[in-house]
Curated annotation (Swiss-Prot):
Its EC number is 5.3.1.12. One of its GO terms (biological process) is D-galacturonate catabolic process. Gene3D superfamilies: Metal-dependent hydrolases (3.20.20.140), uronate isomerase, domain 2, chain A (1.10.2020.10). The keyword Isomerase applies. Coiled coil: none annotated. Pfam families: UxaC. InterPro entries: Metal_Hydrolase, Uronate_isomerase. NCBIfam families: PRK02925.1. One of its GO terms (molecular function) is glucuronate isomerase activity. The gene is uxaC. Keywords: Isomerase. Pathway: Carbohydrate metabolism; pentose and glucuronate interconversion. It is an enzyme of class 5 (isomerase). This is Uronate isomerase.
Length: 468
C-alpha cells in the first residue's frame, strides 16, 4: 500500500517520478489566467485567518459543504466566526474522498504550511491554530505566497473600465513578480438588460473620455481602453461566453441594435445574438492588431438557482456545465477572422468534456505555420481542472494535435493558495508520459526529448507563446 501524498504522489512509475522531480518540479509558474484581487498584491495583504484565505470566495468548498448538509450561514454567512466556518469545512473534508477538493486541500496544507496531517474534525483545531500562527508572519503575505510557489508571472482578469491602479502600484513598487492585466470585456456584450447596458456605457464613457451615443462611439471608447491595457503590459484577452456567436449581420443592423438597447428597449433573441457576434469580431480584430492572445471560456450555464442568486449574487456556487451545439458557430467565427487575415493566437476552453475532441480537431483547421500551437486547446477548466479532466483533455490533444506544443496549466483561481494546482497538473502530466515510456509506447531512447517536452509544457511554451 502506498502512502498518502508522499513525494511520489500520482507518479506510478520510476520514469514518471524522474520526469517530475528532475524536470517539472523545478520550473517556475506562469499563471496566465487567474482571478486574484490586484489590490491584495499591491498592498501585500496579510491574511487574518486560514478561513479568510481558504474559504472566502471559494465556491468549490461552499458547494461541497452545502451538499454535506452544512447550513448556508457557515458558508457565506456574516453571523458566524472564522473558526465556526472552518470547523464545518473540516467536518466536510472526510466526505470528499475522490473529489479533487480532498487532494487540493492536503496539497495546500503541505506545500504552504508544511502540514502533513489529514484534515478532519479531530485535527481541525490544531491545524487551524498552526496555520493562523504562520499567516501572521510577513512571509505568508499575498506576495509571500507568490514567492513561496516560485511564481514568475500572473495575469489577472480585468474589466475595460478598471483603472489598473493596483497593477501600476505593484510594478512601481519593484515587486519582482509580474502582475499583468487581462482584457475581459464581457459587460460590453451584455445587452440582455438595457438599463444595465446603459449604465455600463456611462462608466465606459467616463473612463475613456469618449462621449458615447452610437455603436462607433462605443468601439472608439473600447479601443482607447484597449490601448491603455496594452500600455500596462496586457497580452491576453478573455471572454466568458455561453456559446460561440457567429450570426450574419450588417453594419446598419448593429447600429440600429445599439441605438435600440441604448435607448432602453429590450432586444429580441436574434438581435442579441447578432450584437454579440459583431462584438466578438470587433474584439478579435483589436487583439490581432496588438498581437495578443484571445481566450474563450465557453459552455457554462450560470446562476441557475434564482433564490440564491438574489441572495448572494454571481460566482457563489450555483453554476454548472451547459450543453450547447457550438462547433459550427466556433468554426464560422474563427474562419471569418482567418479569412480577413486577422486571426490572432487563440485558446479555447470548453466546460463540457463532450467537446474535447471537437476542440482538438478544430485547432488543426486554423494552424497556419507562423507560430507553434497558434490555436490552443486550453487546460481542463473549472469542473474539469482535476485529474480525470486534465487527463482527458491531454489525451484528446495528444491524439488529435500536438501535446508537445501545449501552453499548460493555469489556476483560474481567486485564491493565493491555489498554486499547488500547477503541481497537481505537472504530476498528472508526468504520470501520463512516464507510463507511456514504461509501456513502450514512447521509445526510451527518446527520453531527453520527453524531458524537454515536460519542461516546455510546464513553463517554456507559455513563456514563448505569450512573450512574457
Amino acid at each position: 500500500m502506498k502512502n498518502f501524498m508522499d513525494e511520489n504522489f500520482l507518479l506510478q512509475t520510476e520514469t514518471a517520478q524522474k520526469l517530475y522531480h528532475e524536470h517539472a518540479a523545478k520550473m517556475p509558474i506562469i499563471d496566465y489566467h487567474c482571478h486574484l484581487i490586484p489590490q491584495m498584491v499591491a498592498d501585500d495583504y496579510q491574511f487574518k485567518s486560514l478561513t479568510e484565505i481558504w474559504l472566502g470566495g471559494d465556491h468549490y468548498k461552499w458547494r461541497a459543504m452545502r451538499t454535506n448538509g452544512v447550513d448556508e450561514r457557515y458558508c457565506t454567512g456574516k453571523d458566524t466566526t472564522d473558526w465556526e466556518k472552518f470547523e464545518k469545512w473540516a467536518e466536510t473534508v472526510p466526505y470528499t474522498f475522490r473529489n479533487p477538493l480532498y487532494h487540493w486541500t492536503h496539497l495546500e496544507l503541505k506545500t504552504a504550511f508544511g502540514i502533513n496531517k489529514v484534515l478532519n474534525p479531530k485535527t481541525a483545531r490544531e491545524i487551524f491554530d498552526e496555520c493562523n500562527e504562520k499567516l501572521a508572519k510577513p512571509e505568508y503575505s499575498a506576495r509571500g505566497m507568490m514567492r513561496r510557489y516560485h511564481v514568475e508571472t500572473v495575469c489577472t482578469t480585468d474589466d475595460p473600465v478598471d483603472s489598473l491602479e493596483y497593477h501600476i502600484k505593484t510594478r512601481e513598487s519593484g515587486f519582482e513578480i509580474k502582475m499583468l492585466p487581462t482584457w475581459r470585456p464581457d459587460k460590453a456584450m451584455a445587452v440582455e438588460v438595457p438599463a444595465d447596458f446603459r449604465a455600463y456605457m456611462e462608466k465606459l464613457s467616463a473612463v475613456s473620455g469618449v462621449t458615447i451615443s452610437s455603436f462607433d462611439d462605443m468601439v472608439a471608447a473600447l479601443r482607447k481602453r484597449h490601448d491603455f491595457f496594452a500600455e500596462q503590459g496586457c497580452k491576453l484577452s478573455d471572454h466568458g461566453i455561453e456559446e460561440f456567436y457567429a450570426e450574419d449581420y450588417t453594419d446598419a443592423e448593429i447600429n440600429a441594435i445599439f441605438n435600440k438597447v441604448y435607448g432602453g428597449t429590450e432586444l429580441t433573441k436574434e438581435e442579441i445574438l447578432k450584437f454579440k457576434s459583431a462584438m466578438l469580431i470587433v474584439f478579435g480584430e483589436m487583439d490581432w492588431e496588438k498581437g495578443w492572445t484571445q481566450q474563450f471560456h465557453y459552455g457554462a450555464i450560470r446562476n441557475n438557482n434564482t433564490k440564491m442568486f438574489k441572495l448572494l449574487g454571481p460566482d457563489t456556487g450555483f453554476d454548472s456545465i451547459g450543453e450547447f451545439t457550438t462547433a459550427k458557430a466556433m468554426a464560422k467565427f474563427l474562419d471569418r477572422l482567418n479569412t480577413e487575415g486577422k486571426l490572432t493566437k487563440t485558446i479555447l476552453y470548453n466546460l463540457n468534456p463532450c467537446a474535447n475532441e471537437v476542440i482538438a480537431t478544430m485547432l488543426g483547421n486554423f494552424q497556419d505555420g507562423t507560430i507553434p500551437g497558434k490555436i490552443q486547446f486550453g487546460s481542463g477548466w473549472w469542473f474539469l481542472d482535476q485529474k480525470d479532466g486534465m487527463e482527458k483533455q491531454m489525451n484528446a490533444l495528444s491524439l488529435l494535435g500536438l501535446l508537445s506544443r501545449f501552453v499548460g496549466m493555469l489556476t483560474d483561481s481567486r485564491s493565493f493558495l491555489s498554486y499547488p494546482r500547477h503541481e497537481y497538473f505537472r504530476r498528472t502530466l508526468c504520470n501520463l508520459l512516464g507510463n507511456d515510456v514504461e509501456n513502450g509506447e514512447i521509445p526510451a531512447c527518446e527520453i531527453e526529448r520527453v524531458n524537454q517536452m515536460v519542461e516546455d509544457i510546464c513553463y517554456n511554451n507559455a513563456k514563448k507563446f505569450f512573450q512574457f
